[in-house]
Amino acid sequence: MNQSRSFVTGRGRDLSRTPSALSSNSETPGSMSSPSEGKTNAWVNSAYVSNFPALGQSQGLPSHKCSALALRSSQTTYIINFPRQHWNIMTFPNQSEAILANVASYAKDLDGKNSFAVSDTLKIALVLSPTEKRLFRNDTLSHLADVHMYVLDPAEAEGKNLSDSETVYVYVTPPNLTDVKPTTVVLTECAANAKSANDLRQYIVTQLRKMPSLPFGCTTYAPGFLSDGVCKEHPNLFTSEELGAKIKVLTKLLIRCATSMSQDGSNAFCPKHPKVKIVHESNATSYVLFNRPNGMVATNLILSDLPDDDCPTCWILKLAISEARFYALDGHHRCRSGIITSSVFRYLASIVIRVRMDSVLAPSDASSTDHAALVNMMCGIIQNTPAMRQLGISTGSEKVNNRSMRVIIMQENADRLTQMAALYHLFLDYFGALNGWGFYFCSLTSLYGEFHGFSVGFSGEITHVNVASVIAKNWDTQSGIDNILEFKTITIPVHNEDIVCMVERTLAESFEVVMNEHFNGASTIKVRRNGGDSRFNFTISNPRDAFLLLQKAVADGGILQKILCRAMLKAITSHALRADREVQDVSFSFVLKMRLNPVNKSDSKSSELAHTAQMNSLPVFLASTPFTMQLGTLRDALLKKTENVTVINMARTTEEVSKDALQEILKSIGGSSMTLEDTAEPVSDAESIPDPPPRSWASEDEAVNSPQIYSSRRKARKARAASKLSK
């Protein structure tokens, strides 16, 4: 870090302002001390103060104000951006019944794929020593065969090769094993629940369903994660970095869910089914055994009750204990269970909507995204997290393009990589809350162009969510922009950012022209690019009447056809479309967001149309279904139209021209008598070809040094000299 450069440039700010003005718009933890106190700001490191020894003397400032200027010059401001490819114009609510049911089903399937089926015919071997057998009633042990169970001696169990066996081995006391057999569990309360053979089996099966899922033959400490299977099954939904990551995002979320706690400090539980909670104790009565290089290890995770079949939260808790079964949980940061459980739900829901619902939301399940609400929430989360303040991360506001924007401020007396890693895990914990406003990826960009990306591992494809039909609904927003036009554009089969930008720009221009023609003076629309992102904002006169006219125009469909035609006619002539011939189709949907002014019902000028357009709440948005255009067909048609083809009739064919050219070349080589019909004379004896005479270097030297040559040279020199004299 170059402190002197930072101070001189002032990070693009006017350093002539007072220290209080410099810090007035920064929500930095701790307040600036007053002059009477003579204290420095809590964030000012002593090293920074010492680096500006003459600052107070040169400007006549007291030490606390000198420290304030040092503080201001030793921080970096970052603007939050949301890249177009990872942003969608639609999102979904948590309470959607269709999504809840699909997430529960998907989580249950994931658990089933990772474990054996705990069925009525599952083979169970009860490993008992002679002493342990006395803990059970004789009639219980004698009827084990009736319920697909049998007793096995510990020595016999340890000596067998059971790697391919589809049997669960149950110990009633912790065994002293050098090699754990596949699917080995310890249930210390078996005897207390063994009134009959049927009761014993029912107890064991119930415990297995509450324990971490494990496949048959699983003996090693780390056989793999649930997220590995998800990424392999749907590789197009994840980034290449995520596919190659050792611990994937879903695994991180589930592990943090397993270690989370509720508001009162207890372990994570299902709000709908409070009896289903995660239990992790060092002295657990039920656990699974695994092999490690340095010995045997036991899980200490189990659910306190069976998960409900139709509850996504119950199955998320089950997935959490399965994914975290290989980790020592004591050292992990424990976040709020409600926050992290919601994040896992939204993460799984994003996958489910894509793979099971074909990326289409029902009209009742569609909600609007909002940049401003998302930025405000992210800044609020940072403010309310003490760990961020300890790392020198705070929030503030900054003027960018004449607009006041919420920003993230990082002090430079802390490790930047540590700060970014802390922010990443914070956003990951709160993914559920943030995703409710559209978050999948964000970037932090400093005023000097420094870039940091925060991804949750999803590719851009997972954000291609559309609504089943054109809808008009309430727009929940915290934006200071009254009217927004957003597009979600994808190119098929490959992504091309240039074509996406070009299509959206031409659509926005066409929207302005066609709508102004349609309003015929009743209202006027002016569209322009929104500064700093890929959206468009527009101004419109008489918005109350205009919204209903827009709604009717969309319902009619004709005006959309005009907008589409005008935009595509301009788009197909662009260089971007002609340059990339891989792109065959383009699909886009749009959302129109408007903040309507309240209607005064006593005002006679307020029309009935405006009352209808209010929809009982302001503001409102209008969202479309996807439109698809075949760019390949348009490109081919344009080439045929613009191609000027002139047929040239040659006097001779190309074969004739080639033959004549060859004949001319042969004549140049062998003289005028040589033709194509001439053939080379065969040589009967290779030895008959005479060798060339030996080269005589002596004769050449004699020729060069002969008197005749010297005489001619002398005459030439005399002639040149005489010529010069005559001149």
Curated annotation (Swiss-Prot):
This is Non-structural protein 4. Residues 17-38 have a biased composition (Polar residues). Residues 712-727 have a biased composition (Basic residues). Residues 1-38, 673-727 are annotated as: Disordered. The lineage of its organism: Viruses, Riboviria, Orthornavirae, Duplornaviricota, Resentoviricetes.
